[in-house]
């Protein structure tokens, strides 16, 4: 069975092992694959594994041996799932492997912004604490989380884990979710989306990207938010209209943003968020802890074995 990994470097840049995958078939691993290289490299493969390399209906039409696409991520919008279904190609993803790591990054951004960790560390290096007349030094507001409202948009695995951490900080947690009140713990209050944007001090995005959520956070919703509000996005970049976010930050409509994802990655040099006021950006690393990537690799193997046994799991519908 021919197995091809189109872009293995992101999941395994060399610190993990591919040996167990090689044991499952005749396996070829490419670090990265350009769009023009897909058909040549995938020719004859029954199994294709992809992290971010886009697979379209046109690709599938020219790969008659292809029977299985394994997405090495939770989000699967890089694959034309309907086209795969029409051709009888099984598509699987890797659910929940990075839940704890992503929730951890949510709070890395929240704590950096509310405590101004990066800023004060840089100011100490400039000598400002050394020059201080007092034992301590700060010159920006420091925000305590207890009692603040955290609004979570999308209460899946990561959203719920984020909520539990927030409760540990003494925050009030609100959620926009399809779950009913009976399905929610009493510590989480269900809200409509606009109500959540109006009332919450910090808003964290955890919903999937689709036609109804694309650029759902835009100028209209920024105008609903408090001027002290903080937006966190570790979900998908296109959930947010980036120019509108930059405008909201630069004009003081909202206070700050922490983002780990952008609409185009890597970003163009003219992306407005790169120079926006109080915008803290990490380069799509929330998912990439060693522990999370080890889980990803293990679930990848389990998915392939289940497919080979005729009982596929984690199938994308």
PLM segments and residue spans:
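An anion/phosphate-binding loop that grips the pyrophosphate of nucleotide cofactors and donors
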Residues: 45, 63-66, 200
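NAD(P)-binding Rossmann-fold cofactor-contacting core
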Residues: 168-184
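Rossmann-like dinucleotide-binding domain for NAD(H)/NADP(H)
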Residues: 91, 172, 228-317
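N-terminal glycine-/charge-rich "phosphate-binding" loop or analogous flexible N-terminal tail
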Residues: 1-45, 308
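Short beta->alpha connector loops at strand-helix junctions that form conserved
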Residues: 31, 72-73, 89-100, 177, ...
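Rossmann-like adenosine-cofactor binding region
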Residues: 54-61, 179-272
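Hydrophobic/small residue at the entry helix of a nucleotide-binding pocket
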Residues: 158
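Phosphate-binding beta-alpha-beta segment of Rossmann-like dinucleotide-binding domains, i.e.
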Residues: 87, 96-149, 316
């Amino acid at each position: 069975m021919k197995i091809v990994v189109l872009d293995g470097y992101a999941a395994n840049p060399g610190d993990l092992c591919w040996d167990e995958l090689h044991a499952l078939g005749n396996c070829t691993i490419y670090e990265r694959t350009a769009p023009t290289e897909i058909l040549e490299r995938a020719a004859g493969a029954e199994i294709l594994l992809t992290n971010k390399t886009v697979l379209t209906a046109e690709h599938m039409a020219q790969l008659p041996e292809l029977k299985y696409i394994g997405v090495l991520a939770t989000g699967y919008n890089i694959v034309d799932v309907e086209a795969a279904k029409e051709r009888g190609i099984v598509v699987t993803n890797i659910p929940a492997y990075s839940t704890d790591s992503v929730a951890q990054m949510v709070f890395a951004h929240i704590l950096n912004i509310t405590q101004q960790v990066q800023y004060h560390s840089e100011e100490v290096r400039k000598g400002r604490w050394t020059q201080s007349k007092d034992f301590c030094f700060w010159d920006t507001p420091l925000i305590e989380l207890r009692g603040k409202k955290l609004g979570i948009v999308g209460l899946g695995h990561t959203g719920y884990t984020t909520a539990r951490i927030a409760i540990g900080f003494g925050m009030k947690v609100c959620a926009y979710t399809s779950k009913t009140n009976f399905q929610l713990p009493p510590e989480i209050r269900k809200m409509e989306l606009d109500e959540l944007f109006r009332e919450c001090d910090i808003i964290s995005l955890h919903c999937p990207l689709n036609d109804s959520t694309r650029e759902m956070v835009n100028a209209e919703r920024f105008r609903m938010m408090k001027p002290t509000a903080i937006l966190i996005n570790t979900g998908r970049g296109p959930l947010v209209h980036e120019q509108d976010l930059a405008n909201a930050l630069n004009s003081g409509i909202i206070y700050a943003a922490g983002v780990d994802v952008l609409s185009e990655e890597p970003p163009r040099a003219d992306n407005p968020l790169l120079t926006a006021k109080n915008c803290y950006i990490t380069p799509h690393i929330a998912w990439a802890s060693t522990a999370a990537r080890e889980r990803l690799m293990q679930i990848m193997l389990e998915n392939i074995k289940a497919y080979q046994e005729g009982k596929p799991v984690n199938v994308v519908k």
